[in-house]
Amino acid sequence: REKAWSAFLNEKELFETMLLGNSKKLREAEKKEAAASGNGGEPDWEALLQEAQDEGEVQNQNQFYIDEKAYKRLEPHLEKKKGINSDAYKGYQSGPEFDDLRCFLQTCQDLGIEPMLVIVPVNGYYYDYTGFPKEAREKYYEKIRKIAEEYGVKVADLSDQEYTKYFFEDRVHLGKKGWVMVDESLYEFYK
């Protein structure tokens, strides 16, 4: 637990530093992260993924491969959720969030900030259960890719992880395995 807490504090410091844009502090935080990895360089992403996999196999024994606490909160409502979204053929094709994203990316361009978008998938097991069409989800991911392309920004596209066991904490939020993949993408982007 001490190792996990130390890694969390190092990561917290790294993200605070990135948000503040202080490159000296960023380099110091990266050195701490590398030292915490035990290999004197990059974090051992394969080992971190394996650790997340091992923990998931022990802790997430349900049909959606999510955290047991989240599953227990969801379980009483499962019967009424089955197939409920089968008519969601348009998915998330419209909404003010896409304009918000464009506004954010335009602001980044105006200020000379180089962002990276992370396309976080939804839990494919759960979304299939509710009948939310895979094609609608794919259109949603594609729309984000196109917006990123319009603004020439990099994308960490994790949309192919919808069916990765132990990737999610609950129906849509990242779990341990998901965070390892996001962390690796961010590490590579800011390296």
Where on the chain are the PLM-derived regions?
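Short coil-to-beta-strand
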Residues: 71-76, 112-116, 153-156
